[in-house]
């Protein structure tokens, strides 16, 4: 059995750790609310961009445009959004598992890493890291999405990559986050039109939309903005998911610390009781020996 001194030291150590995890939980909660607010405020703009692209595709018929067909290259650009820090449960490992289990072969992947954890993990596994945007996840803004979007679009137009994908963690609510992989380019026209048919109010929302110049030229302007909006939406959702995951992890760690402290307190009291009993037994035995 551990001595009372050992138990006391371990209890104090766990109490100190519990205070840290509790503080980290509170910080993550505040950051989560800020990121969640960002995502909610930006959603109307992103929805409008999606509706605009969908409407253009519906009205254009069999339009031919580079953004609607795969490039000549077999390489596939993939924007992978993870965090710069750990202590977030399975947040980073889940998105990495999604990327590595996807149909994108390691040999064909050209990774645009957003987040240090993802960059380091994929580099160790032999993935080609084209660009590193880890600093973005400290406080993502729309300008960051424009920079990332321009980099992948330039590679697509130059036929350095034939397809562009985006891997991030979709924020559902405080406790639910879903690793997600979507194709950005080429735009899947058939899937987009099918999605449009499911939308009951789409026609009502888009009746006043007309395009000047022609649809082909308009796509040159709209698609980059559409891609940027998807990337920014993914950044803020990923940030909210990261802090939600960290909040849950720290809450679980704090609860575990409290359980361990309770268990150690019980062990300490038992050890103390045993020590007192032993001392009393020795005193009584000594008194009997004198008598």
Swiss-Prot record:
Q: Which UniProt keywords apply?
A: ATP synthesis, Cell membrane, CF(1), Hydrogen ion transport, Ion transport, Membrane, Transport
Indicate whether Transport appears among the record's keywords: yes
The principal localisation class reads: membrane
**GO terms for biological process, alphabetical:** proton motive force-driven plasma membrane ATP synthesis
Q: How does it sit in the membrane?
A: Peripheral membrane protein
Q: Per the record, GO CC terms?
A: plasma membrane; proton-transporting ATP synthase complex
**Per the UniProt entry, what species is this protein from, by scientific name?**
Lachnoclostridium phytofermentans (strain ATCC 700394 / DSM 18823 / ISDg)
Tell me, how does this one assemble?
A: F-type ATPases have 2 components, CF(1) - the catalytic core - and CF(0) - the membrane proton channel. CF(1) has five subunits: alpha(3), beta(3), gamma(1), delta(1), epsilon(1). CF(0) has three main subunits: a, b and c.
What is the name of this protein? ATP synthase gamma chain
Family according to the record: Belongs to the ATPase gamma chain family.
> What role does this protein play?
Produces ATP from ADP in the presence of a proton gradient across the membrane. The gamma chain is believed to be important in regulating ATPase activity and the flow of protons through the CF(0) complex.
The protein's GO terms of the molecular function aspect are:
ATP binding; proton-transporting ATP synthase activity, rotational mechanism
Taxonomic placement: Bacteria, Bacillati, Bacillota, Clostridia, Lachnospirales
The record's listing under CDD domains reads:
F1-ATPase_gamma
Localization recorded for this chain is:
Cell membrane
């Amino acid at each position: 059995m551990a001595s009372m001194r050992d138990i006391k030291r371990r209890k104090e150590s766990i109490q100190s750790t519990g205070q840290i995890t509790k503080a980290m939980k509170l910080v993550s909660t505040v950051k989560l609310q800020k990121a969640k607010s960002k995502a909610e405020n930006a959603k109307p703009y992103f929805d409008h961009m999606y509706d605009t692209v969908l409407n253009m595709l519906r009205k254009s018929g069999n339009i031919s445009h580079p953004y609607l067909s795969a490039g000549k290259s077999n390489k596939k650009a993939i924007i992978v959004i993870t965090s710069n820090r750990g202590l977030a449960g399975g947040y980073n490992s889940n998105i990495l598992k999604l990327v590595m289990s996807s149909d994108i072969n390691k040999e064909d992947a050209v990774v645009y890493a957003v987040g240090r954890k993802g960059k380091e993990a994929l580099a160790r596994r032999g993935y080609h890291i084209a660009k590193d945007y880890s600093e973005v996840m400290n406080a993502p803004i729309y300008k960051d999405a424009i920079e990332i979007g321009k980099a992948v679009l330039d590679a697509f137009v130059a036929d350095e990559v034939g397809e562009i994908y985006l891997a991030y963690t979709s924020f559902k609510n405080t406790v639910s986050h879903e690793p997600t992989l979507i194709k950005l380019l080429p735009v899947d026209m058939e899937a987009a039109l099918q999605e449009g048919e499911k939308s009951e109010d789409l026609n009502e929302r888009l009746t006043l939309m007309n395009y000047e110049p022609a649809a082909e030229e308009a796509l040159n302007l709209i698609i980059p903005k559409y891609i940027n909006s998807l990337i920014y939406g993914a950044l803020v959702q990923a940030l909210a998911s990261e802090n939600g995951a960290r909040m849950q992890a720290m809450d679980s760690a704090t609860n575990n610390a409290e359980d361990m402290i309770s268990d150690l307190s019980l062990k300490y009291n038992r050890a103390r009781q045993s020590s007192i009993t032993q001392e009393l037994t020795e005193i009584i035995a000594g008194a009997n020996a004198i008598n």
